[in-house]
A protein has these predicted regions:
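Bacterial N-terminal signal peptides
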Residues: 11-21
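Immediate post-signal peptide segment of exported/extracytoplasmic ligand-binding proteins
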Residues: 25-39, 65-68, 91-97, 144, ...
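Extracytoplasmic "Venus flytrap"
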Residues: 39-53, 76-79, 160-167
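Bacterial N-terminal signal peptides that target proteins for export
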Residues: 2-12
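C-terminal lobe and pocket-closing loops
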Residues: 131, 217-257
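Hinge/capping helix and adjacent helix->loop/strand transition within the periplasmic-binding protein
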Residues: 62, 86-97, 105-201, 249-257
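Signal peptide-proximal N-terminal region
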Residues: 58-70
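Paired acidic/hydrophobic, glycine-rich loop segments that form the ligand-binding mouth/hinge
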Residues: 94-101, 205-211, 229-231
Length: 257
């Protein structure tokens, strides 16, 4: 969660709020009372970013002096780069606009990639909704139930993605290069919500998504057994899926790991 430098928000933690001088709290209450905060989401409705943002919007105003209303505004495009650029260039730095976009965009700025029009050092960072634990899941209809079977069969699976710079695209590409996975990226969807629709329509047969988003927004597909999670690509194996192999354990060389 990000916003431009400007009037600061009271932290949600009660202990922090109590430490704020009363005069400052009164000033913030006067400013935010009756106001609306715009929460810009860089991806389409129906995905994990959207769900997190709507839950935050429902509760966050109760923890800000003055109890402003939070309104979610989806602004998908280029793996949330459009929203990040808007937050930096167009949104007024007055404490009434917050952005929720892919954190990996900061690395795009560091690498000097085209399209980045913001300076990540000039955002004020409020926090993150969750630590994403990325997994690749494929359709049951492919007949693929394990990473070993997938590699041995050579079955080309189309993976739905959003755009370079996000985990939906970058992680499958890395796993293709390091593990030799036979996959083809089909990028350009506005978020994992539209990817899920494409998955159900048979346009793509797989997705790289966070485990948290799989549980929240792909619940029906998971409960019906329509998705087989084959590999996890996290900093460490996730305890909720001990049966799913961890990508570094599958790598055959130190460079791949």
């Amino acid at each position: 969660m990000y916003r431009r430098s400007g009037r600061s928000l009271v932290a949600c933690a009660i202990v922090v709020a109590l430490a704020v001088p009363l005069a400052r709290v009164a000033a913030q209450e006067s400013f935010y009372k009756g106001k609306t905060i715009r929460l810009i989401v860089g991806l389409a409705p129906g995905g994990g970013f959207d769900i997190y943002s709507r839950v935050i919007a429902r509760h966050m105003g109760k923890h800000i002096a003055g109890n402003p209303i939070l309104v979610v505004d989806n602004m998908p495009g280029a793996a949330s780069l459009l929203a990040a650029n808007f937050n930096y260039k167009a949104a007024k730095p007055d404490g009434l606009t917050i952005g929720n976009f892919v954190g990996g965009l900061v690395f795009q700025q560091m690498l000097g990639l085209p399209g980045v029009e913001f300076d990540g050092l000039k955002f004020e960072y409020l926090g993150v909704p969750a630590q994403d634990n990325f997994m690749i899941g494929v359709a049951k209809s492919t007949g693929i139930t394990s990473i070993e079977q997938w590699k041995a069969s050579g079955t080309l699976i189309k993976i739905g993605g959003v755009a370079p710079g996000g985990g939906t695209d970058d992680i499958p590409k890395i796993l293709k290069a390091t593990l030799g996975l036979p996959l083809q990226m089909v990028s350009g969807y506005k978020g994992t919500g539209p990817v899920r629709l494409a998955f159900n329509a048979g346009e793509v047969q797989g997705v790289c998504n966070s485990l948290e988003s799989f549980k929240a927004t792909w619940r029906s597909e998971m409960e019906r057994g329509e998705v087989n999670i084959l590999v996890q690509a996290n900093l460490k194996p996730h305890p909720d899926v001990p049966h799913v192999p961890w990508a570094p354990d599958l790598a055959k060389s130190d460079d791949a790991k």
